[in-house]
Regions:
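Polar, enzyme-active/binding microenvironments
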Residues: 1-300
């Protein structure tokens, strides 16, 4: 700010250090294609494939920044599920029952148990969503209704029911997303893809593309500052979004896809995977150190 009395201009400078991934504690239940949301120190891993990807699990675990602990099971085991919220108030929605069958089931977490809520208008799995959404406001977009059919329809959640409101420009499945219900980014998807679209609360706009095409990635952050990491085929790369462009930063220790993700651009979390060789219960923590200082400039 500028002080008219002293003729001094004070500026705030933020300096970012080198970003890194480091190992965290393993999940109790190995899984992939699960819902993941929360923060680096308070994350949720919900349902998904089990150890050998031969069946789905009802298991729900929470991460406290140092270890995972089991909580109450969900009502319906599923994979290809997405979610949003916190460890005290979460929401999961959509599912793949088998390669040719999907569902629109919704469940809400109240810090004690899961309860069944209204289903989506269009059943789908492997969709895009806003990981920073809440139990009162979030969205689901695109995904799959069959292995070869991808709806472009978007639905918003108001705490009670789903409503169709808009369509994404390019329909696809296995896309990742970050942000909130009125301001979000979705990236990548089937093929794999480099496509990125931005949501402003009323419509979707295609914006700057990813550097590396990917699908089945995880993501974290807000519309103007986010991360996309991992993805198929067994990608380790992390890309950071600054509101206008993507920059490749630190790689995961192990490339993986169908992983869960949560957190921010400076403190993210990656957990689980579809590929057995990548450690289906492995957790990695992303850290991008930053320092903030004030600079005073005299005005002549």
């Amino acid at each position: 700010y500028y002080n008219t009395t002293t003729n001094l201009l004070k500026l705030t400078k933020t300096v970012f250090g080198t970003a890194t991934w480091s190992s965290g504690s393993n999940m109790g239940t190995p899984r992939g294609s699960h819902a993941g949301f929360g923060t680096q120190s308070a994350s949720s891993a919900v349902s998904g494939y089990d150890q050998d990807a031969s069946a789905v699990t009802v298991n729900y675990e929470e991460y406290d920044g140092s270890s995972w602990s089991e909580k109450a099971n969900v009502n319906t085991a599923r994979y290809g599920v997405v979610g949003c919220g916190t460890t005290t108030a979460g929401l999961i929605y959509g599912q793949v029952v088998n390669p040719s069958t999907v569902g629109g089931l919704t469940e809400e977490w109240n810090n004690t148990s899961w309860s069944v809520k209204n289903v989506m208008n269009t059943s789908r799995g492997n969709s895009g969503t806003a990981g920073g959404g809440t139990t009162e406001a979030t969205f689901v977009v695109s995904g799959q209704v069959s292995p070869s059919s991808f709806p472009s329809a978007m639905e918003t959640w108001n705490g009670t029911s789903w409503t169709e409101v808009s369509e994404i420009n390019t329909a696809r499945r296995n896309l990742s997303g970050f942000g909130v219900s009125t301001a979000a980014i979705v990236a990548g998807g089937t093929s794999p893809s480099i496509l990125v679209e931005s949501w402003n609360g009323s419509s979707w706009t295609e914006i700057t593309e990813l550097n590396t095409a990917a699908e089945e990635s995880a993501a974290s952050g807000i519309q103007t500052s986010g991360l996309v990491f991992g993805g198929a085929p067994n990608i380790a790369r992390t890309e950071e979004w600054n509101g206008s462009s993507w920059t490749e930063v630190a790689d995961l220790a192990t490339g993986r896809n169908q992983l869960g993700g949560s957190g921010t651009t400076t403190a993210g979390l990656a957990f689980g995977a579809e590929n057995p060789s990548g450690g289906r219960n492995a957790t990695e923590e992303f850290t991008a150190p930053q320092s903030i200082s004030n600079v005073t400039v005299a005005s002549s």
